[in-house]
Amino acid sequence: TSFTLYMR
């Protein structure tokens, strides 16, 4: 899962 991309 792209957590960092989501949390921008």
Curated annotation (Swiss-Prot):
Nacreous layer of shell. It comes from the Eukaryota. This is Uncharacterized protein SMPP11.
